[in-house]
């Protein structure tokens, strides 16, 4: 039961990150900048998780955790920074395709570290994810025209750093209390981002102009829920599978765009959504067992 609960939590975290796009789009329409929103996401997320850790964590804080979790926090802050830079330079559809390179990067990273070649199921799943991502993003219809190379590089870097976020979630202190771990990781990521982009929105009156409620929403759906779910789920199911499951983020974005934002979703995009969902299920099917003679005999007896 713990295994399937962990799968559910990773899926929930990825879906939550997909919901983030709804609030981000509304925030940009109101005139808030990507840096104000990413800063709000991490700063408010860190405060919320710190409060939760104070009340619910069963593990005591130690300064050594700051050093051990620093790589995860750095990748978290980098993903936010790189992705927003990519969105500002290339189309949204291309940016999300570039971000979704985390799927094969994550599986490859696990294979290199563990010195274990990915299973056939994972290769099939990755191929389906690649095709489904291009279709669901709408890139197959709009095409790529005069791509900004700087934006392209930032997009690929966001995919690489997000793969490392998932990787570190399963490798660094896997048995650590998830409340304390999430609080430290998000808070340090907020501090790192603030060094590059000082959070002037905290003192320039933007919070009272509508940024506060939006900042809290992006913090909950973009930091608190996904990071906590990854902290709980990834150590129990492994990095490779968690990376593939996290691809459910894109179908969530497409579904919300259609039903909440009332945006038109084409037939190829729907096909991409179903292909991604099918790809997520592939690693869970025991194909060799399913087609083995013993399994067929078992089915006949039933």
Describe these PLM feature segments:
Residues 1-36, 40, 74, 78, ...:
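Glycine-/small-residue-enriched transmembrane alpha-helix faces in small-molecule transporters
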Residues 4-9, 35-52, 121-131, 150-157, ...:
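Hydrophobic alpha-helical transmembrane segments of multi-pass integral membrane proteins
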Residues 16-21, 56-94, 99, 133-135, ...:
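Specific transmembrane alpha-helical segments of multi-pass solute transporters/efflux pumps
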Residues 27, 37, 41, 86, ...:
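Hydrophobic/aromatic residues within transmembrane alpha-helices
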Residues 48, 53-57, 83, 102-127, ...:
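C-terminal transmembrane-helix exit sites in multi-pass transporters
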